[in-house]
Curated annotation (Swiss-Prot):
GO MF assignments: acetate-CoA ligase activity; AMP binding; ATP binding; metal ion binding
Record-listed E.C. numbers: 6.2.1.1
Lineage: Bacteria, Pseudomonadati, Pseudomonadota, Gammaproteobacteria, Alteromonadales
Keywords: Acetylation, ATP-binding, Ligase, Magnesium, Metal-binding, Nucleotide-binding
Pfam families named in the record: ACAS_N (PF16177), AMP-binding (PF00501), AMP-binding_C (PF13193)
GO CC terms in record: cytosol
InterPro entries per UniProt: Ac_CoA_lig, ACAS_N, AMP-bd_C, AMP-bd_C_sf, AMP-binding_CS, AMP-dep_synth/lig_dom, ANL_N_sf
Stored PANTHER family: ACETYL-COENZYME A SYNTHETASE
Modified residues (N6-acetyllysine): K609
Residues that bind ATP: G387, E388, P389, D411, T412, W413, W414, Q415, T416, D500, R515, R526
Amino acids binding Mg(2+): V537, H539, V542
Name of the protein this chain belongs to: Acetyl-coenzyme A synthetase
Amino acid sequence: MSTQSLYKVPSEIAANALVNDEQYKKMYQESIVNPEGFWREHGNRIDWIKPFTKVKKTSFDDHNLFIKWFYDGTLNASANCLDRHLENNADKLAIIWEGDDAKDQRTLTYGQLHAEVCKFANALRSQGVRRGDVVTVYMPMVPEAAVAMLACARIGAIHSVVFGGFSPDSIASRVIDGNSKVVITADEGVRAGRIIPLKANIDEALSHPDVNCVEKVIVMKRTGGDINWVEGRDIWWGSLMETASEHCIPEEMGAEDPLFLLYTSGSTGNPKGVLHTTGGYMVYAAMTHEYVFDYKENEVYWCTADVGWITGHSYMVYGPLANGATVLIHEGVPNYPTPARLGEMVDRHKVNILYTAPTLIRALMAEGKEQFEGFDGSSLRIMGSVGEPINPEAWRWYNDVIGHEKCPIVDTWWQTETGGILISPLPGATDTKPGSATRPFFGVQPALVDNIGNIVEGANEGNLVILDSWPGQMRTVFGDHDRFVLTYFKTFRGMYFTGDGARRDEDGYYWITGRVDDVINVSGHRLGTAEVESALVAHELVAEAAVVGYPHDIKGQGIYAYVTLTKGSVETEELRQELRQWVRKEIGALATPDLIQWAGGLPKTRSGKIMRRFLRKIAANEVTNLGDSSTLADPAVIDTLIETRLNRSE
């Protein structure tokens, strides 16, 4: 298949890379054979207040599960992102901020960011926040979001960042679960030209009858818009900062003390609070950031993720700042007001490393490469992809149009639960294949198992599990350790179950086939939906595709494809048949879609993830009880898909 084409490491990257292929293999082998020794060495890449002597104490036994790393050491995450850089790099840019409107620009040096964080840490203390308290952060993409997180870490409070697109009900459930004492927000946010009513959403969330834990709401003035004000509860960020001291000694935290909570989106039932602790997480975030992106001193690094997602935590705040990087933060979306915005920002800020999501790449691809005719891109050296498997066609477009065929692409696979990247190419070490996450990071032992838990060897496919712990791993589900054990360690005993399916090819490269519940069983054959989607998107008239299974009288499950065409393409029955033949040719007769529904848009969360549970229900003609759609960017998309569905009962 065309997906097997190999892209060699560019010679100019190989010449200066942190590790080459031989070094990767040697380091990886050491990390698996001698994890104690390996992580003892690399655990010292960050600053410890009391150095650790104990490295690893972990068990994946579901009757006696525990995960501890560097567990007798003490440190502070904020000090590792700020104080350690002050002696030599106080004047170096830590943050470059560009607003939704490109005319809004701000910068903060490491010295300035340190001062802001210390002041806000003292402000939090003045409002009664103490070590171990949970603070909810519901902010736009402004530097103050990072300041709030680092200030919490400085005083030992646990931050719980909620994505600024979430509904009041979603906020309320997270505030209740975390028992938050203080909420930090802004009057309004600005995103793609639209005003986001952040404070109004908080007011509504806190009016929920079960929310009785919040004592204070700190409000940053972003737009100056009119907002409701609750005397005695609400307080302006600015007025707190006016009187706060710039001196704040970082709290000495145990390596296993909590750093943050982050609730996984899209899960059914109660929100699942993923708990990450301080020591192992900081080591892993910093190390993966440096090695996966081959980070060099003085480079400008842009991760387009929102701070409300794990990618924003690990690869916009903690990892890059621990490494002393200059981080670009963008308030808006990289294809507003025009698709050219991404390229304009890369050129304007001389971005060296770009980390973005397949959903954005596909959106830009649908607009056409002529949008990038004025794009120079000469500053770019490394490009990354995150969030979901990237279609080979989108990978190639990213490589050709954005990377000008000179930038290695690191297609990273990981999860909220893993804290950092688990499987990814390393720019100077790994020849890449479009659509493959390739090889495991140091210390990570992936395996494939069949449905009863037997490990399958060689070129094969199955359920993706991890056989041993790594420092960035989540420690528990907040307040519900039994749920942690049940979700991740009961399905396959003694292994961490990722919930993803994967294929390993003859070179040992891993291909993520999607969530296991995104596997279709057609006439007894397992088929990853990502594979069918990739084939559809490879057609020149297809901008995006989502594939699900639906009940089929003969096959058990049939293949139902939702297809969005490129601009200007016409939806015809001839094209529908052409696409069916196209997939048949690309993958085989088994993968031919039974039904292809034209879709002007797909139901996505505001982070761009397709909400497949809605698509599965519509395909199954179960349209009366679709469940909560509050996390969707555009709920109206659902109504249109229901109206135009193909699998109606007669």
